[in-house]
Amino acid sequence: MARGKEIRVTINPECINCFRDSGRRYRGISRYTTQKNRRNTPIRLELRKFCRYCGEHTIHKEMKK
């Protein structure tokens, strides 16, 4: 009865500034949890969110699973 893959999937966007400078300046890597519709956004999602380790709004990209 199932049609295959689910259309809505859970993704984890990650701060690219913390990921790039890991170990040097910041204490950790900021990650959020959200959902996306695979049919409407087939490419990787980029969101501008607040990173508590950087202390500013940065771009968060969807990670590989």
Curated annotation (Swiss-Prot):
GO MF assignments: structural constituent of ribosome
Subcellular compartments: Plastid
Lineage: Eukaryota, Viridiplantae, Streptophyta, Embryophyta, Marchantiophyta
Family matches, as InterPro entries: Ribosomal_bL33, Ribosomal_bL33_CS, Ribosomal_bL33_sf, Ribosomal_zn-bd
HAMAP family named among the record's database cross-references: Ribosomal_bL33
Gene name linked to the record: rpl33
Keywords from the UniProt entry: Plastid, Ribonucleoprotein, Ribosomal protein
Assigned GO CC terms: plastid; ribonucleoprotein complex; ribosome
Homology family: Belongs to the bacterial ribosomal protein bL33 family.
NCBIfam families: PRK00504.1, PRK00595.1, rpmG_bact
GO biological process: translation
Protein name in the entry: Large ribosomal subunit protein bL33c
Gene3D superfamilies named among the record's database cross-references: Ribosomal protein L33
Main location: plastid
